[in-house]
Amino acid sequence: MTRILLLLLGFYQYFISPLLGNNCRFHPTCSEYAKEAISMHGSIKGLWFTFKRIIKCQPFCNGGYDTVPISIKNSKPLNKKI
């Protein structure tokens, strides 16, 4: 499922997005955010993060720099005990 979603996003970015122009209020763009979220968290959780991001991408939001939340279980510890 993850691979299919990433292929669909790639299709959108290559063929559809150039026709629509740059309308995203955020960096990275919503489609790039979706690719990162799905790659990092899998299809279900990645789609949930993408849905929340697209809801925020509207005229009443200032936009800006917004990254995909990092999963605590996937992150590496900052320091090691010796």
From Swiss-Prot:
It is found in: Cell inner membrane. InterPro entries: Membr_insert_effic_factor_YidD (IPR002696). It holds the Pfam family YidD. Keywords: Cell inner membrane, Cell membrane, Membrane. One of its GO terms (cellular component) is plasma membrane. It comes from the Bacteria. Its main location: membrane. Belongs to the UPF0161 family. Could be involved in insertion of integral membrane proteins into the membrane. This is Putative membrane protein insertion efficiency factor.
